[in-house]
Amino acid sequence: MVGRTLDWNDELGRWLKPFVDRLGHRARRRMCPLYVSGLIGPGDRKSVQPMAKRLVLGEYDQLHHFIAAGVWEASPVETELLVQADRLVGGRDAVLVIDDTALPKKGTHSVGVAAQYASVLGKTANCQTMVSLTLARGEVPVMLALRLFLPESWTSNQARLERAGVPADYRTARSKPEIALAEIDRAIAAGVRFGCVLADAGYGLSAPFRQGLTARKLAWAVGIPRHLKVYPADVRMIWPIAGRGRPRKRYIPDILSMAAEDMLANARWRAISWRSGTKGKLKARFAAVRVRVADGPPQRIRDKGQQHLPGDQAWLIGEHRISGEKKYYLANLPAKMDLRTLASIIKARWICEQAHQQLKEELGLDHFEGRSWHGLHRHALMTMIAYAFLQYRRLKTARREKKNQRAAASANLARRAPGHPRSHRSTTAAAMSPLPKMDSQRAEWPTNRY
């Protein structure tokens, strides 16, 4: 046990070196490995005091100062996380998933806390909400960013923002889609590679968000509410027939927009399986048609009042689940893409929910007990670094198992007698567990090597 634990500590120390090198001061360089290992290690609570107690090093004051009170810039470490995440799972076949996660809280003093919808509880609750970016390839997610959303009750109260230490650049009211676009820009600037941006209807409803992704030349597939308006793909702009009143000066569409669910009412639906789950293949019925989204400039159309003109062409996709639930999506993916591929891309978004759950249940994302902006974001950053390390170990183990399987298959093939040829089917690594299990008993904690 001791040997294995020391090996793990050594591996963590080596893996953390690029992050530690960006921290500057010697004390911060020593506290970072301690904090990360405290998050990964055993214990029900991953806040500063219980972690310091488990370290048995009397490090509470220094750990607390490192996370909550120290004066240091987190952005270089955040950039390093983007670089390391791209090395782990980046590529054109990766997806970037936009979502948010709620951290239930008591009281009113923790930064950003307010009565708002908490997805983890399925209702409105007193909580903090953090916009998240998750990079995923296959079934391996790595969290890239967690940025706090500030409700109006906070952005309208400068004294409250000052007490929580909110930086000046973040005191202006920003919607969740606006925060997401800013974090996407940060990821792109760091060279993170991905093929498609995915988001749920909370973001897909926002025309500026969709248009912002398109302006950045990004492929996207987002959830939308069933009532979002669209036009047929072949809608034409015509000169309106003159009637009473002043003559019209602008073209109008030759057909009115309609709700997404109505556009798919007579579509052809197909049963599609997109991946295997613990209880077998995951299936649903899908349909897709090309449309033009009603997110152009608003204009009065005949006697129907103001309507948005046709915007860019996109896929409108519907999903009928076995439970009876219906979901709708928009995607600016290529017009020649087949329905099965569209469905597979859309359903890849589920991986971020697994990442949120693991960050909370195994690494204590929602255990931070401080009230400040910097403290919350530094704690969140350390949990993301810990998560990235565990995914690094997960991928390393999978590659080793795959190599061993191939070696065994080659040996078996070599032992076969001539005259009995058999087709050789390539093997793959066994399904990987969500996160690698670490030793529950720890001989010692990582020490500073830098």
Residue map of PLM features:
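A short, flexible helix-boundary coil/loop motif
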Residues: 1-27, 39, 150, 157, ...
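Conserved, well-structured functional cores that handle cations and Mg-NTP chemistry
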Residues: 2-198, 202-222, 226-229, 236, ...
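Generic structural signal for hydrophobic core residues of well-folded globular domains
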Residues: 39, 43, 55, 67-70, ...
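Catalytic-loop motifs flanking and including active-site residues across diverse enzymes
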Residues: 129, 351, 355, 377, ...
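Short amphipathic alpha-helical "interface-anchor" segments enriched in bulky aromatics
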Residues: 98, 102, 203, 251-262, ...
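Non-catalytic, well-ordered alpha-helical scaffold segments
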Residues: 30-34, 49, 327, 340-343, ...
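A generic structural motif
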Residues: 134-136, 277, 319
